[in-house]
């Protein structure tokens, strides 16, 4: 697992905090943040209409943050989600979302897997 320097980690945490507030305005209930497994981390786990949303938050100013979610990152997320569900509720309905934060604006991309 790669560790970010304090400046990058602080920026990421700030983006995640803002993302949680944005998601609440859309009717999401925050379940958990920064869930870790040996495979990786899920930034935000939220519930809406009975569906768990595993949300990757990406922020950036000088590039399009969506490109930071690679096929490799998605595979790690899926393995981490399996760990979470096996510990909590294996029968939960779920989807994987991305929340892009760029220049103070939010864009929620739901169900990003192929």
Curated annotation (Swiss-Prot):
Q: Which Pfam families match?
A: UPF0102 (PF02021)
Q: What are the disulphide bonds in this sequence?
A: none
Q: Could you identify this protein by its name? A: UPF0102 protein HPAG1_0809
Q: Which family does it belong to?
A: Belongs to the UPF0102 family.
Q: Which InterPro entries match?
A: Restrct_endonuc-II-like, tRNA_endonuc-like_dom_sf, UPF0102_YraN-like
Q: Name one GO molecular function term.
A: nucleic acid binding
Q: HAMAP family, from UniProt? A: UPF0102
Q: Which domain of life is it from?
A: Bacteria
Species per Swiss-Prot/TrEMBL record = Helicobacter pylori (strain HPAG1)
């Amino acid at each position: 697992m790669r560790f970010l320097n304090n400046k990058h980690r602080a920026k990421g945490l700030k983006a995640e905090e803002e993302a949680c507030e944005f998601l609440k305005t859309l009717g999401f209930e925050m379940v958990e943040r920064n869930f870790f497994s040996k495979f990786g981390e899920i930034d935000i786990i939220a519930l809406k209409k009975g569906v768990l949303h595993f949300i990757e938050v990406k922020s950036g100013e000088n590039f399009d943050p969506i490109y930071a979610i690679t096929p490799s990152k998605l595979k790690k997320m899926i393995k981490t989600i399996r760990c979470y569900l096996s510990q909590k509720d294996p029968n939960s309905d779920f989807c994987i979302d991305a929340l892009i934060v760029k220049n103070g604006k939010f864009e929620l991309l739901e169900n990003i897997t192929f």
